[in-house]
Amino acid sequence: HLESDSDPDQTIEAIHAAGCKAAVSVKPGTPIEQVYPYLDRLDMVLVMSVEPGFGGQKFMPAALDKIEALRKKAGSTLMIEVDGGVDAATAPLCVRAGADVLVAGSAVFGKPDRSAAISAIRAACENGESGL
């Protein structure tokens, strides 16, 4: 998390030195601009669309503005991931805003037919269906 006590520059350097890709997550209350100084060294940014800690929370629409701003600032090379409240209604909104990777925990694992849940999310994204 960007909000941790670790020095972001040192952490990113250590991750790259280990031959891995570097990513950082940003909590809902943190302005997305705080990640901008590190964009040239990051491979991915995870935009949290709920407060981290437990599943089943409602998607926070303010995350969409963060995704859009991040995509505009970083261009197409940075991967943007979204985690929290992602389902068939919110996933297309995230993709439209510029997200590349979606984490849909409760929307998949909270359903009796996980395959159907994944298919519904994919279909919604492909068809551009959305709504909060």
State each model region's role.
Residues 64-67, 91, 118:
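Short amphipathic alpha-helical surface patches that serve as generic macromolecular interface elements
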Residues 6-9, 32, 88, 111-115:
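Loop/helix-junction capping segments adjacent to catalytic residues or to phosphate/diphosphate-binding pockets
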Residues 2-4, 46-56, 97-117:
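Glycine-rich phosphate-binding active-site loops on the catalytic face of alpha/beta enzymes
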Residues 45, 70, 83, 94, ...:
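Conserved, mostly hydrophobic/aromatic
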Residues 30-42, 86-102:
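Catalytic cores of alpha/beta
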Residues 15, 95, 110-132:
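C-terminal helical cap(s) of enzyme catalytic domains, especially alpha/beta-barrels
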Residues 85-86, 108:
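Residue-level detector of alpha-helix initiation sites
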Residues 1-79:
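Conserved anion-binding
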